[in-house]
Curated annotation (Swiss-Prot):
Keywords: Cytoplasmic vesicle, Hydrogen ion transport, Ion transport, Membrane, Synapse, Transport. One of its GO terms (biological process) is synaptic vesicle lumen acidification. One of its GO terms (cellular component) is proton-transporting V-type ATPase complex. The gene is Atp6v1f. This is V-type proton ATPase subunit F.
Amino acid sequence: MAGRGKLIAVIGDEDTVTGFLLGGIGELNKNRHPNFLVVEKDTTINEIEDTFRQFLNRDDIGIILINQYIAEMVRHALDAHQRSIPAVLEIPSKEHPYDAAKDSILRRAKGMFTAEDLR
């Protein structure tokens, strides 16, 4: 019998999270904790960081998607994450385009390969 797959978690603005929820990623774990956080104007940095760390520690989550401008608020927590699972991917939002220069995870991944490896 096949095991259950891993979930995608998302931390983002209302439009981003709503889009992913409409796509079917919304789940509650056995403790009734959701796999998403809608970041609003009154959401504290501590709340974002706590949710990110909770997602990192959940064994049912395989990928964490986070709006890049929100990732900037908790960059130290993202930079401290060293495991490959859950994978953390920074994504654009409607108001903030993606900037590869700000993506520390992408920079780390690029550092793992030389030009020769990619030929």
